[in-house]
């Protein structure tokens, strides 16, 4: 009998930035080794299998187990791993040591404590391929565009037209990360309403995608916003995602296809700029130019009786060389704008950066415009009916 005994398996991807080697460029091997030592001790006690990787200065813990989502033991294990890595980071005087650990001690769940988390639970299919995405220098809304392409755009995913098990479409769970609420939208019927929301990178993020015909989980994203948790800028959220592929879900090639055409995402230097999301292999996930451009890696696994077979470093494929060239061209063009919009994020997305502190120094130096007065709606009105020069 298989070790799973027909039980559901849970895939948990939990990430944190606990220190970078030379700025924000890389989580060094010493930190990964510290995490691996903690996870190895928990095999067969808490988890079934694990893989530790990095994207830029973020450590990503990929774990399989049978304890379900939001399990205290699994989350506590990840927290301990990050704590041990933080100890090493402080010994090495790494930049930003422990920066994503926003609480002094673990309290049952990493959500709201700094680390990002994406988890899904399912019964293994006859063959269970999954793709784990890890990003650096961007935030959860970076997945809005590619997830829409994967699960709602037939020009990207031919299976939406040709696969009878997908033709009924997918359901999107969208989170208002500012208002702390969510909504479910069905595609293709509610596609336009979905786009009205997820095109807003400031407020709305896709959290999960479900197959409509049986409500089976298809994808999940970490949507934790560090700035709203900490109350100040402590780094970009650097999201992770899990996507199931094949046999009733988009094929692996359809899951990867959206990244063949790089799109602009918020983040990059100081979390304050728009820039391209560049797909790279694990070895190239070391953003240096202006702390970027933002990177994304894609690791393919086969889940076999709860074990993680792999990974296959999917974006290392030569087929994405042109995408990388495009991303660098996009970076060249938008970098010319320097501190000006549209390279610089709008003021509403800079609220938790250091910009407001800079502007505070000018507050007392502003004076009213002569002959004009502001009205509450943000427009202007004349003080009297006469002409004002």
Curated annotation (Swiss-Prot):
Binding, Mg(2+) 1: 17, 24, 57, 99
Active site: 17 (proton acceptor), 233 (proton donor/acceptor), 236 (schiff-base intermediate with dhap)
Annotated residues for binding of Mg(2+) 2: 57-58, 136, 238
Biological or metabolic pathway of the protein: Carbohydrate biosynthesis; gluconeogenesis
Binding, dihydroxyacetone phosphate: 24, 137, 270, 291
Any one GO molecular function term: fructose-bisphosphate aldolase activity
Chain sites annotated for binding Mg(2+) 3: 236-238
InterPro entries (UniProt xref): FBPase_V, FBPase_V_sf
Keyword terms of this UniProt record: Carbohydrate metabolism, Gluconeogenesis, Hydrolase, Lyase, Magnesium, Metal-binding, Schiff base
Catalytic activity: beta-D-fructose 1,6-bisphosphate + H2O = beta-D-fructose 6-phosphate + phosphate; beta-D-fructose 1,6-bisphosphate = D-glyceraldehyde 3-phosphate + dihydroxyacetone phosphate
Binding site for beta-D-fructose 1,6-bisphosphate: 24, 95, 108-109, 137, 246-247, 270, 291, 352
Domain of life: Archaea
Subunit structure of this chain's protein: Homooctamer; dimer of tetramers.
Similarity-based family: Belongs to the FBP aldolase/phosphatase family.
NCBIfam families to which the protein is assigned, alphabetical: FBP_aldo_phos
Function text: Catalyzes two subsequent steps in gluconeogenesis: the aldol condensation of dihydroxyacetone phosphate (DHAP) and glyceraldehyde-3-phosphate (GA3P) to fructose-1,6-bisphosphate (FBP), and the dephosphorylation of FBP to fructose-6-phosphate (F6P).
Annotated domain remarks: Consists of a single catalytic domain, but remodels its active-site architecture via a large structural change to exhibit dual activities.
Protein name (database record): Fructose-1,6-bisphosphate aldolase/phosphatase
Gene: fbp
